[in-house]
Amino acid sequence: MALQTTGILDDLIARGYRYMNTSNADNLGAAPDGRLAAWFAASGAPYSPEVCLRTPADRKGGHLAIRRSDGRMILRDTAQTPDEDMRWFTDEHRHRFFHTNNLWFDLVALRDALAARGGLPGLPLIRNRKHVDPSDPSSPEVFQVESALGAIVELFDGARPVLVPRERFLPVKTTDDLALL
C-alpha cells in the first residue's frame, strides 16, 4: 500500500493526524462531512465504509456480507460471484446495503493492520472479462485484474459500516451521467 511504503502513513501519524477519509474520484457525492468525521472519531472503530440502501439499480454493485467460514465482514463484488449465486448476490432484499467506496480509516489501526501482514493488505483479486475494444464484441477478450480497497474491511476487527443518505453516492461513469447532474 503506497501510504505505507512511501512513509506517508507514519508521517501523517507523527504529525498528529488520526483519521483519513477516501473515496472514488468519480463519486461526486463524496464531499467531506464533519458530522461523519465526528461520528467516526467517537465510534472507536478502526474502519468504517459508508453504505446506502440498495435499489434495483445497484444490483451489480458491491455489498458487505459475513463470510461463513470465519464470520468476518467482507466486501463482495459482482466479478467475484459465481454465476449460480448471482440471483442471491443481486437480491436487494437479501443484501439491503450498497457499498459506496467512501471509506473512513483510523490511521493507527491501518498502520498496525498492515504491519501485522508484512505491509501487504492481501486484498482479494477481482478478475473482469473485457474486450480489447469495448465497442467491438469481436475484438480479443482479455482479463482486467484489480482489487477493491473496500475489501480491506476483512482486516479489521470492529469495522462498523455507517448508513448514509443516497446523496453521498453520485458516481459519474459516462457523459450521460454527468449531464443528469
Regions found by a protein language model. Name each.
Residues 1-5:
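Active-site-proximal specificity loops/subdomain of glycosyltransferases
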Residues 10-24, 29-181:
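Catalytic core of tubulin tyrosine ligase-like
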